[in-house]
Amino acid sequence: MIFDKEDFESFDPELWAAIHAEEIRQQQNIELIASENIVSKAVMAAQGSVLTNKYAEGYPGKRYYGGTEAVDVVENLAIERAKELFGAKFANVQPHSGSQANAAAYMALIQPGDTVLGMDLNAGGHLTHGASVNFSGKTYHFVPYGVNSETELLDYDEILKIAKQVQPKLIVAGASAYSRLIDFAKFREIADSVGAKLMVDMAHIAGLVATGAHPNPLPYADVVTTTTHKTLRGPRGGMILTNDEALAKKINSAIFPGTQGGPLEHVIAAKAVAFKEALDPEFTTYIEQVIKNTQAMAEEFAKVEGLRLIAGGSDNHLLNLKVLDLGINGKEAQDLLDSVHITLNKEAIPDETLSPFKTSGVRIGAAAITSRGFKEVEAKKVAQLVSEALVNHDNQEKLAEVRKAALELTRQFPL
């Protein structure tokens, strides 16, 4: 059976109600989660296409199934657009997620038990950069590096010192909650000084890299992994890039048959759409506005007594705030703001003292609100509303005012 919208609603009203509720939530909430964005109708159309019916194990021209002529075209379009977008010689667009892209990259680069340097979770790293609860920390011997305790910036001299002490086979650069520029050339120097490979996870900053708003890691890294959503504004998925032909072959084998079976060609089609959108000059304008909006919010937060900008501000699409001095932890701040139609997430900060389920801070991103049409004026208003709620977290009258203002703002910028 093929359902249209009305048939779907009548066939499965419970599921339809949940989807509709999420649509309303997205319409009414100011979305500040840094890893989220709002995709185009074209991206959604591609992901919801008949390609979801097709199995296509293998790669274009080398499939284990017949009838793959059309999906070969789809996947090749995604590959060629990704290569053009990031200046890469090779691209694998099959990873189902950023985590699976990282898993395959590790498989291609190192062996189980090898020593790896990765950014500490509290400093802004990702679970797949060596967290003990993650496959990465269980499979490989990860040694963490952090940030300077005073500046909260990456300390490249300290990273070099750690690298010389532990002699890693691989160094992982990139983060999920680091608000400043990353110097990939320095990471390359450090890796070369100890004979290590360099892998860059640019999941959060891919959209910035694509437009030149952040240095491109491709000239320096052996392998680059990324997600295709976040600032790239595509479907949820992953990708691996390299300029090394031998590594490209290992990466392809690590994805299939190493860690995945059939690729999700409907998602790959949506990736191809997103890459084409990102190649358009309008996307550069969008990313420029994302950065302007982030900095506008940072300026407002800097005025609020009791709030502290981690690392002193932002060079990219996100910023981190310490909220604990306001008498509220990160989890409480997240829940409080959700109640007034503002969505963000709790976030650990450098030298964190609370558990990951509480945290001392929150993370804020501007990608989604910028996709919605917000500019600096609205971004400043958003920061003011967040601050008003956090400062007055026990004042129901003030919170009601914030809730009303947030709803009014989202009404002005419908999805």
Swiss-Prot record:
<comment type="subunit">
    <text>Homodimer.</text>
</comment>
<comment type="similarity">
    <text>Belongs to the SHMT family.</text>
</comment>
<dbReference type="InterPro" id="IPR049943">
    <property type="entry name" value="Ser_HO-MeTrfase-like"/>
</dbReference>
<feature type="site" description="Plays an important role in substrate specificity">
    <location>
        <position position="229"/>
    </location>
</feature>
<dbReference type="InterPro" id="IPR001085">
    <property type="entry name" value="Ser_HO-MeTrfase"/>
</dbReference>
<dbReference type="InterPro" id="IPR015422">
    <property type="entry name" value="PyrdxlP-dep_Trfase_small"/>
</dbReference>
<dbReference type="InterPro" id="IPR039429">
    <property type="entry name" value="SHMT-like_dom"/>
</dbReference>
<comment type="pathway">
    <text>Amino-acid biosynthesis; glycine biosynthesis; glycine from L-serine: step 1/1.</text>
</comment>
<dbReference type="GO" id="GO:0004372">
    <property type="term" value="F:glycine hydroxymethyltransferase activity"/>
</dbReference>
<dbReference type="GO" id="GO:0035999">
    <property type="term" value="P:tetrahydrofolate interconversion"/>
</dbReference>
<dbReference type="GO" id="GO:0019264">
    <property type="term" value="P:glycine biosynthetic process from serine"/>
</dbReference>
<keyword id="KW-0663">Pyridoxal phosphate</keyword>
<dbReference type="InterPro" id="IPR015421">
    <property type="entry name" value="PyrdxlP-dep_Trfase_major"/>
</dbReference>
<keyword id="KW-0554">One-carbon metabolism</keyword>
<comment type="function">
    <text>Catalyzes the reversible interconversion of serine and glycine with tetrahydrofolate (THF) serving as the one-carbon carrier. This reaction serves as the major source of one-carbon groups required for the biosynthesis of purines, thymidylate, methionine, and other important biomolecules. Also exhibits THF-independent aldolase activity toward beta-hydroxyamino acids, producing glycine and aldehydes, via a retro-aldol mechanism.</text>
</comment>
<keyword id="KW-0963">Cytoplasm</keyword>
<feature type="binding site">
    <location>
        <position position="121"/>
    </location>
    <ligand>
        <name>(6S)-5,6,7,8-tetrahydrofolate</name>
    </ligand>
</feature>
<dbReference type="InterPro" id="IPR015424">
    <property type="entry name" value="PyrdxlP-dep_Trfase"/>
</dbReference>
<dbReference type="GO" id="GO:0030170">
    <property type="term" value="F:pyridoxal phosphate binding"/>
</dbReference>
<feature type="modified residue" description="N6-(pyridoxal phosphate)lysine">
    <location>
        <position position="230"/>
    </location>
</feature>
<comment type="pathway">
    <text>One-carbon metabolism; tetrahydrofolate interconversion.</text>
</comment>
<dbReference type="GO" id="GO:0005829">
    <property type="term" value="C:cytosol"/>
</dbReference>
<feature type="binding site">
    <location>
        <begin position="355"/>
        <end position="357"/>
    </location>
    <ligand>
        <name>(6S)-5,6,7,8-tetrahydrofolate</name>
    </ligand>
</feature>
<feature type="binding site">
    <location>
        <begin position="125"/>
        <end position="127"/>
    </location>
    <ligand>
        <name>(6S)-5,6,7,8-tetrahydrofolate</name>
    </ligand>
</feature>
<keyword id="KW-0808">Transferase</keyword>
<protein>
    <recommendedName>
        <fullName>Serine hydroxymethyltransferase</fullName>
        <ecNumber>2.1.2.1</ecNumber>
    </recommendedName>
</protein>
<keyword id="KW-0028">Amino-acid biosynthesis</keyword>
<dbReference type="InterPro" id="IPR019798">
    <property type="entry name" value="Ser_HO-MeTrfase_PLP_BS"/>
</dbReference>
<dbReference type="Pfam" id="PF00464">
    <property type="entry name" value="SHMT"/>
</dbReference>
